[in-house]
């Protein structure tokens, strides 16, 4: 299994590539070729936090993914990220997890790239 940190991703994946990836993803969704159900939200009221889970499956790409974004505002008080996130990449043929990525950076890239993909 591949483990990719923010630094690893920066070395191999540019914002231009992220824009192109977003365009492909939007096309797959628009064409009904991607199963991307609504995200699941689980509250952690004791800690003023929540867990968000966003799965997707694209048969054409033989791939699935799961992004977990956790929002815990109190983390700022102890020097931890407020929105830590991870992305699991999963082989669509076998169900085996093939990579774990820094989801915080991936989310930042995707947010910017979505704007670029719109033009």
Please annotate each region the language model reported.
Residues 1-110, 114-116:
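N-terminal ligand-binding/catalytic initiation module
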């Amino acid at each position: 299994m591949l483990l990719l940190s923010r630094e690893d991703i920066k070395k191999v994946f540019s914002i231009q590539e992220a824009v192109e990836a977003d365009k492909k993803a939007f096309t797959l969704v628009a064409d009904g070729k991607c199963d991307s159900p609504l995200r699941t939200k689980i509250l952690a009221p004791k800690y003023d936090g929540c867990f968000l889970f966003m799965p997707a499956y694209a048969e054409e790409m033989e791939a699935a993914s799961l992004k977990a974004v956790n929002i815990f505002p109190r983390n700022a008080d102890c020097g931890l990220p407020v929105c830590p996130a991870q992305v699991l990449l999963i082989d669509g043929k076998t169900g085996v997890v093939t990579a774990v990525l820094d989801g915080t950076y991936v989310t930042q890239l995707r947010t910017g790239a979505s704007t670029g993909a719109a033009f």
